[in-house]
Amino acid sequence: MTAPAVAINGLAKRFGSALALDHVSLEVQPGEFVSLLGPSGCGKTTLLRIIAGFESPTQGRVSIHGQDVTDLAAEQRPTNLVFQRGALFPHMSVGMNIGYALRLRRWSAVRIAARVEEMLALVRLEGMRDRMPGQLSGGQSQRVALARALAAEPKVLLLDEPLSALDLKLREQMQLELRAIQRKLGATFVFVTHDQTEALVMSDRIAIMQGGRIVQTGSPQDIYRRPNSVFVSGFIGQTNLLRGRIVGQDGARSTIDVGGVHLSAPTLPGMAPGDAAILLLRPEALRLRDPGRAEVAGCALEGRLTDQVYLGHCVRITIAGPGGIPLFADLREEEAEGLNKGDIVALVWAGSSPILMKEDFA
């Protein structure tokens, strides 16, 4: 059986009395693109630095391709790290930057030159070998940093928010390029970000971190469609939270009283009538009621339109739901045409759309 590219077992890290990592375990398979996603201070960068060898864990072990590297220095590990800002050597040309680690490994000049050209082609910077870092744009600098990190063929590439300093359009372009490079090489990437879009676009799996712990791991689709907590649902995409109490169950479905309105959702095992509950609804799951189409019982709400915002790909409307709670719906432009502030709007959704959660998960 192939060993994981990265195996993290029971990692804990303290800085004085502060617990930065709380017994974290995670496996990354060879060729996987895994993102560590979470808010500032959740421990994701600390975890990456421990994998890289720049921090030592208080407890736990790190293995790379079956080798325990916990006690090895950073330069002895088969990893490379790309920082938030490229950290290029300003006195070296692009080619010299890319070939730096290869010279330390005593590669021949001919071999280094060939590898530099190969890396420049990979990141689409052909012809820029002799440029200096001060002559590069932000996106070009990050491409050079990526080429430098990949040149020595690390077993695992670690990336610490490498796109966060770029403007939006360039960041979106680089997300696709980075993912394409990873797929082409079949390399193992561990990527730290606080940007949910980056994680969704690029990752094979996402590990959501909160308070020094990994609270959910899964594919982008799994985490978006089946979040295991209110925190995860809110961190990945916009969501509507409707709080209420279960008042009935009929096999696979539960009825929840939300401010006097009975709504229906797939039953969550372990929940029973009388339990406090939270109903999650994604804005894109909501549609205007079609008078000619039968709706699913318990999957409709009416409210007064309080706002609408044009987002380009959709129009996000806000209605006052049960108890005045704002409810967001993302409608097609033609759907929202003719709606005005103050209108009574009826929204419906598919019976499979709601996600039921226990109130104590909040």
What are these regions (language model features)?
Residues 7, 27, 63, 346-348:
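ABC ATPase nucleotide-binding domain
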Residues 33, 74-84, 88-231:
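ABC ATPase nucleotide-binding domains
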Residues 37-39:
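The feature captures the beta-strand-to-loop junction immediately N-terminal to the Walker
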Residues 52:
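Helix-to-loop junction immediately C-terminal to a conserved catalytic motif
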Residues 58-61, 111, 211, 243:
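Conserved coupling/switch loops of ABC nucleotide-binding domains, chiefly the family-specific signature
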Residues 60-68:
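Conserved ABC transporter NBD signature motif
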Residues 239, 249-362:
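Non-catalytic connector elements of ABC transporters
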